[in-house]
Amino acid sequence: LRDFSQTYYKAELKNPNFFVRAYMSETDDGDSYNMTALGLLTTQALAPTYIGTYAGALLPKILTGQTVTDADKAAAQAAAYAAVQPGAGTNLAEDQLKAVREGLFQRGGAGFIDNSRLYHTEFNYNFGHLIDFAEIQVGGNFRRYDLFSDGTVFNENQGNGTYERIEIDEFGFYTQISKKFDRLKATASIRYDKNENFDGQVTPRASLVYSAGKDREHNFRASFQTGFRNPDTQAQFIFFPSTSGILLGSTRAN
């Protein structure tokens, strides 16, 4: 990461009975690049036959009884001789390194772009001051992921040479009720969450807390809860070729 930054903004309104808050974050990739791609592409440009020459020299030396260390040293030396040799007074290696670093990944370079944003709003309201028999709360949230990497990380390619931002929306809402019975406190809640790329999820929870002792200093708790996790944005929309294969997001839209 080089000159990479993330900026956060937040606004909040609250009192003892409710809160509403909103925040956003935005990413600036600066001059960041993929180091693996930088090394590989620079080597391929300066020594296109390096791997073949190295492998061709290594195996025969091992088969003739040389140690792996000696064979590796000799093979690396042979491959280095096969590399493009810069002329006197030139900076071929530095120039090639700079060109690859400034080019975009998946288009002959190692640089990547991340100009993504996140928008999130949430609220909660407690009806405790209006209802006597129990404490009831309701709340919810909305979130938007606004992704853009110009095709260097996410699969924004529209198939016609253009790259468009990817937007993912999700929302959720919940209600919770709590009731005290002398030494016992019972709480139950239910929540619904929906991401546009996945089925909605219902997650109920319940708990009982019993306070024992003269001063109620001993608490015993029993609870039941459920949860889930949707894949993150990269797991949904990544498209990332590597030397071992292609990392591909799992959503249908990808």
Residue ranges and their predicted role:
Residues Y23, R205-S207:
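A structural signal for beta-strand register positions
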Residues G30-M35, E196-Q201, Y210-N254:
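Surface-exposed extracellular loop regions of Gram-negative outer-membrane beta-barrel proteins
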Residues Y174, T203-R205:
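One-face residue pattern on beta-strands with alternating periodicity enriched for small/polar residues
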Residues K10-N157, Y163-F198:
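Face-selective signature of the C-terminal outer-membrane beta-barrel domain
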Residues R2, D146, D169, T226, ...:
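Flexible, active-site-adjacent loop/turn segments at secondary-structure boundaries
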